UniProtKB/Swiss-Prot annotation:
Its EC number is 6.1.1.20. The gene is pheS. Binds 2 magnesium ions per tetramer. This is Phenylalanine--tRNA ligase alpha subunit. PANTHER family: PHENYLALANINE--TRNA LIGASE, MITOCHONDRIAL, PHENYLALANYL-TRNA SYNTHETASE. GO terms for biological process: phenylalanyl-tRNA aminoacylation. Its main location: cytoplasm. It comes from Corynebacterium glutamicum (strain ATCC 13032 / DSM 20300 / JCM 1318 / BCRC 11384 / CCUG 27702 / LMG 3730 / NBRC 12168 / NCIMB 10025 / NRRL B-2784 / 534). Belongs to the class-II aminoacyl-tRNA synthetase family. Phe-tRNA synthetase alpha subunit type 1 subfamily. Keywords: Aminoacyl-tRNA synthetase, ATP-binding, Cytoplasm, Ligase, Magnesium, Metal-binding, Nucleotide-binding, Protein biosynthesis. Disulfide bonds: none annotated.
Length: 340
């Protein structure tokens, strides 16, 4: 190619580049004008066929034309990149003065909140939090807790038994097995709180649910008495329900404690009234339970107690239907979640 034809090819490339509207078009035009099949690259490849005395000038003409086209391509590319960046910024621009709809933030479930509040109270007393499996051996759920073989709590009407029949595995009916496991694996003294899910064959209604949460406490040490139990429950009740709260005990029977009692709580409720409400069970650990875990009841005594989290939440907050706690309706959970 002559110098004139090379300049014409470079001018055509420059004119084409100027007409590109975006980077994709520019890339396509570069392939057309500076790709392998374009005039200037072809002229460069043919330099070897030109007589030696003309090759130097021909090479200079080719390089000048190619350099001019490449330089202009680079300039146009910079302009189009700036244009693209400006368009992207405009699309992504946020007007911070425009009012927005506040996003709803998730929060903990009220049962979880209450569980953590109770755990914090016990930790503040120097107690430890202990947990255990939900699928439990009958030995830990019943035998070691002094339940007789024919106790009604063992039946299918009260307990979920795990297949196959005869496996002696159940869904735990209380968190007391955690106490047994702890006493077997730890040296006394022991002060533990045992939160967790438990399972019973109750129908779901306003006051019952087949899956619910318990918090149980166990203390085993030298010289513990019912007075220590009463003081612990008084402190827990005042922390949960307020400084005006009172507790009382009524004699009862449980296989794993002796003597045993029901504990009631009195406190001003959210509706402006006050009254005694049954809260949970408690008592001194039965000597048979201590012997079953290798603790000498002549040297050590212990007390234990337990209450339902759902029931506590229900009467503390004036809730009429326990089903609201398990059905997942955000209208129920949102007011509690604000506290989280």
């Amino acid at each position: 190619m002559t110098e004139a034809s090379l300049n014409e090819a470079a001018d055509a490339a420059i004119k084409a580049f100027d007409g590109a509207q975006n980077l994709d078009e520019l890339a396509a035009l570069r392939r057309d004008h500076l790709g392998d099949a374009a005039p200037i690259p072809q002229a460069r490849r043919s330099l070897g066929t030109i007589p030696k005395d003309q090759r130097k000038d021909a090479g200079r003409f080719v390089n000048m034309a190619l350099g001019r086209a490449e330089k202009h391509f680079a300039q146009v590319k910079v302009v189009l990149e700036e244009k693209r960046n400006a368009e992207v910024l405009e699309l992504e621009r946020v007007d911070v003065t425009v009012p927005t709809t506040r996003e709803q933030v998730g929060a903990l479930h009220p049962i979880t909140i209450l569980n953590e509040q109770i755990a914090d109270i016990f930790v503040g007393m120097g107690w430890e939090i202990a947990e255990g499996p939900e699928v439990e051996a009958e030995y830990f759920n019943f035998d070691a807790l002094n339940f007789l073989p024919d106790h009604p709590a063992r039946t299918l009407q009260d307990t979920f038994h795990i297949a196959p029949e005869g496996s002696r595995q159940v869904l735990r009916t209380h968190t007391s097995p955690v106490q047994v496991r702890t006493m077997l694996n730890r040296e006394v003294p022991i002060y533990i709180a045992c939160p967790g899910r438990v399972f019973r064959t109750d129908e779901l209604d306003a006051t019952h649910t087949p899956v619910f949460h318990q918090i149980e406490g166990l203390a085993v040490d030298k010289g513990l008495t019912m007075a220590h139990l009463r003081g612990t429950l008084d402190h827990l009740a005042k922390e949960l329900f307020g400084p005006e709260t009172k507790t009382r005990m009524r004699s009862n029977y449980f296989p794993f404690t002796e003597p045993s009692a029901e504990v009631d709580v009195w406190f001003p409720n959210k509706k402006g009234g006050a009254g005694w409400i049954e809260w949970g069970g408690c008592g001194m650990v039965n000597p048979n339970v201590l012997r079953a875990v290798g603790v000498d009841p002549e040297e050590y005594t212990g007390f234990a107690f337990g209450m339902g989290i759902e029931r506590t939440l229900q009467f503390r907050n004036g809730l009429s239907d326990m089903r609201d706690m398990v059905e997942g309706d955000i209208r129920f959970t949102l007011p509690f979640g604000i506290q989280a």
